[in-house]
Structures are given as structure tokens and as C-alpha cells.
Amino acid sequence: MAHKKGSGSSKNGRDSNAKYLGIKKFGKQIVTPGQIIVRQRGTKIKPGLNVGLGRDYTIFSMIAGRVNYSTQKNKKIVSVDPSYGKIQAIEIRKASHFAT
């Protein structure tokens, strides 16, 4: 008899690895150059001033400063304000140095 059994368990039971997408730094948090602010698929959030856009649409900080989210024409935009970051970035580096 040329029939298959009805179990089908070998076709099920797969799952993809977690991609850990989302906002990594929220508004008014301090960032240093190169820190990831948003991991996303596509440009749900657009890059603003002092941030870069990676080829996988990751938004990262290009300078030290404070993260700022805003909306323009119904589009979310993230930027980094440099005026606050200079003093705080030095403090973060000192704190991380003492933590190790």
C-alpha cells in the first residue's frame, strides 16, 4: 500500500532565533559614539541629526549626547543632542572604567 502515515511530526517543531529588535536607548538617555539606539527592520524610525543608519536599518549614535525622539509629518525621528553629552560621556567612561 503506497500510503503515508499521518504523524507529520518531522515537518513541525522549528522556530527561528530571537532577533532582539526594538529601542535600545530611550529619550533623554546618554549615548556615546557608536552606541546602538534602535534595532529595526526597515525605517519605522527615521534617522535625524548626529545619528547614522546601518545597512540593516540600525540607528546608532555618531557623537556623545542625549537621545531625542520627535515626530515630523507623522514620521518618528531619533536624533542626538550634543550639548548635554560632553560632560556626561566622560562620567560614563569613568564609571565603566571603575566597574571592570
Swiss-Prot record:
It comes from the Eukaryota. The keyword Ribosomal protein applies. PROSITE patterns: RIBOSOMAL_L27. Coiled coil: none annotated. One of its GO terms (molecular function) is structural constituent of ribosome. InterPro entries: Ribosomal_bL27, Ribosomal_bL27_CS. Its main location: plastid. Disulfide bonds: none annotated. Keywords: Chloroplast, Plastid, Ribonucleoprotein, Ribosomal protein. Belongs to the bacterial ribosomal protein bL27 family. This is Large ribosomal subunit protein bL27c-1. It comes from Cyanidium caldarium. The gene is rpl27.
